[in-house]
């Protein structure tokens, strides 16, 4: 019994040491770890300084105007322009824009508005990640050097049959081969399924672990694999703060 207690204490001690190591890694990978859902200027002020990459949800309104909101039927009256001003003041930082409602009718107005903002605030196109479910409408952005990504909209692999999973992989191969986007972006639970795919395609990966805080990425074996994967360019994490919406 005494030997079992000693082994238990040693294991517990090692777990504490490992957890502390992960905790102290927070902030050590600004090149890869970004802030998920920074949809208010208050959150940008509170948390933006801790991340070199922020993610913002955007809905396109009339004349290509970009409204910072997660849902198309909701508005907080927050224009995207202050975020470009923030990027102008923080050279080297990047912004990931999850565009919720890109379509045939607004794609050109969106491109013109985006390009105008980049010119006004002197922001290189490469500093923006433009993400949409409409990968087929992204070529115009891609050829003008915006970093574009297709939002992979699929259930968890664990909820799919093998045939359904293979169908998703095949569909994404067509996207990767199209040249319309530079990356595929997907929830973290798709990483192990997709990490070995499309190696003959010129395509990169982005992901989000929106239920995990930053230190959990360093703690979890899959998170460590993500950090070491050169094809995976960004991982968004949860950091709600006081002004999350």
Regions of interest found by a model, annotated:
Residues 2-245:
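Phosphate-group recognition and catalysis centered on beta-loop-alpha active-site segments
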């Amino acid at each position: 019994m005494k030997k079992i207690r000693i082994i238990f204490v040693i294991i517990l001690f090692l777990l504490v040491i490992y957890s502390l190591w992960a905790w102290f890694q927070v902030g050590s990978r600004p090149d890869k770890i970004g802030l998920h859902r920074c949809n208010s200027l208050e959150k940008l002020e509170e948390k933006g300084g801790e991340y070199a990459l922020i993610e913002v949800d955007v809905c396109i309104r009339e004349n290509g105007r970009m409204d910072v909101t997660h849902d198309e039927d909701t508005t907080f009256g927050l224009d995207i322009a202050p975020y470009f001003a923030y990027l102008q003041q923080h050279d080297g930082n990047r912004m990931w824009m999850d565009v919720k409602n890109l379509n045939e009718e607004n794609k050109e107005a969106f491109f013109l508005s985006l390009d105008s903002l980049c010119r006004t605030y002197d922001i290189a196109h490469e500093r923006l990640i433009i993400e949409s479910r409409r990968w087929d409408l992204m070529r115009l952005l891609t050829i003008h050097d915006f970093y574009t990504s297709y939002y992979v909209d699929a259930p968890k692999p664990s909820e799919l049959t093998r045939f359904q999973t293979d169908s998703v992989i095949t569909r994404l191969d067509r996207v990767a081969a199209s040249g319309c986007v530079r990356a595929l972006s997907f929830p973290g639970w798709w990483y192990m399924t997709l990490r070995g795919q499309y190696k003959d395609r010129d395509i990169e990966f982005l992901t989000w672990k929106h239920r995990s805080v930053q230190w959990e990425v360093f703690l979890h074996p899959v998170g460590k694999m993500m950090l070491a994967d050169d094809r995976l360019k960004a991982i968004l994490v949860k950091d709600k703060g006081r002004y999350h919406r």
